[in-house]
């Protein structure tokens, strides 16, 4: 399992290449912004069919991470569904797949701005969740400490010998972690955007996702 280990508020964590964060002591896998049903919502609103493969791709990667970690707890940090109508319109195959992934483990859906209400799937539905020194919620709050959130879909630009590439990234400073979007068809906000630059402290680091996740100083 390719990962990048780091400490946060005295807790040993690891960022996986997928953008998930793994808390081994709690056997907890944390992901954010799955945006399941995004292609359905795009088609519904625009009338233009979108490729319907994003749900399968996202759930496949989630299944792989669960298998690799043998997680007993899965926390989804909000915007797990692109909207509540998209959640209701999930194909039966996808609903059964989620049910299989939930079997034998605790599953927590944190409310997001795209999916603020309860959904017709198993698991607990919470506005936020505290565990030890950490608090899990969808959107970062000013002044928070030990906060793990998502929402902003952070990404960084990485120079290579050939060109500059853009990759999703886990942002970490002394107060908070912001996870990238886990879902397929999700865009991102560059770490040098004033919103993220304002949220993250001067010591912030970025863990660049991919086959070999690596920690760098957060680009500003």
Regions from the PLM with identified roles:
Residues 1-76, 80-220:
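Extended recognition/assembly regions associated with phosphoester-bond processing machinery
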